[in-house]
Amino acid sequence: MQATKIIDGFHLVGAIDWNSRDFHGYTLSPMGTTYNAYLVEDEKTTLFDTVKAEYKGELLCGIASVIDPKKIDYLVIQHLELDHAGALPALIEACQPEKIFTSSLGQKAMESHFHYKDWPVQVVKHGETLSLGKRTVTFYETRMLHWPDSMVSWFADEKVLISNDIFGQNIAASERFSDQIPVHTLERAMREYYANIVNPYAPQTLKAIETLVGAGVAPEFICPDHGVIFRGADQCTFAVQKYVEYAEQKPTNKVVIFYDSMWHSTEKMARVLAESFRDEGCTVKLMWCKACHHSQIMSEISDAGAVIVGSPTHNNGILPYVAGTLQYIKGLRPQNKIGGAFGSFGWSGESTKVLAEWLTGMGFDMPATPVKVKNVPTHADYEQLKTMAQTIARALKAKLAA
């Protein structure tokens, strides 16, 4: 892989994972992804982050297209997750760096991942600066974005922010800059990444942005460890504003309905609800759990105002695809949502109670009584569903107007 020049002395190195579709084992990456590392040439030439271990050869080739890897003096490891630090042992062997800089929690994570004995590790503190020669870098801890060890690196004179996982997207492309990607594609990839990885840490996101802005960080280049680089002040402002928007989790007039069904009764109910919400002027997304991955459902929920869940009763509970999706969503802590529950049953009928408990447990408002139907829905049942949709739509409109 050839390095990509960002500005004089700054190069993107790393690897493109064209085949990635299962990112971190729990979320889809339908466009693939990248593992970005950044080479900064100076009196102390420094590599920021590495790549997954299996891509170490591509990383070394990228570095070698700029300089001999043995000329690297420093390594900065901003985050120890193995898609960014997996190639660290190979880099240490190839480069023999004078020092390896990381956060205090990064040092602990490095020890527990690699069990090293004699690496030249040096801890840097929040706000600490390091001179590389002509250039100076400042480190800022960004804990829980999205690991405890996370930090970013800021070059004030060059206005370059190496942001680690923050502002990342799962995009594998020959284009390496944000202004080369259609804005709707970029924004969707950013939202999917944030919703499925960073969303539990929305308060930390807002705090980190406040801290960085307060420290005078106003980048013209944002260099994340996944996806494309944001190039230009306007592009960087776009990225920051989107993160604030995602973290604030303000509701919209969008309703997501997800469900599973055995003999189509719950599916019929879901379709009636979708049409009823549309009649109320809502934007509707109807998602069958067997056709839609849980991360796709969460991506749609991230900017929705209401989430309606359906399942038939199964062994006094709910179907496993619905249960798994709810468990996944709960861990991501969506806020400011209205909920609703529906489902069919044969004899015991507990599913709607279980669904309502899930949604209430996630802090969702529940303005409408769940609707349950014995076996196959009738016209009267459909009228109940329409009433449910009207009640939730009114509550959503009131929430948006507040």
From Swiss-Prot:
InterPro entries: Flavodoxin/NO_synth (IPR008254), Flavoprotein-like_sf (IPR029039), Metallo-B-lactamas (IPR001279), ODP_dom (IPR045761), RibonucZ/Hydroxyglut_hydro (IPR036866), Rubredoxin-O_OxRdtase (IPR016440). Its cofactor is FMN; Fe cation. It holds the Pfam family ODP. Keywords: Electron transport, Flavoprotein, FMN, Iron, Metal-binding, Oxidoreductase, Transport. Fe cation 2 binds at D83, D165, H226. SMART domains: Lactamase_B. Binds 1 FMN per monomer. Binds 2 iron ions per monomer. Its EC number is 1.-.-.-. PANTHER family: ANAEROBIC NITRIC OXIDE REDUCTASE FLAVORUBREDOXIN. Catalyzes the four-electron reduction of one oxygen molecule to two water molecules. This is Rubredoxin-oxygen oxidoreductase. It comes from Megalodesulfovibrio gigas (strain ATCC 19364 / DSM 1382 / NCIMB 9332 / VKM B-1759).
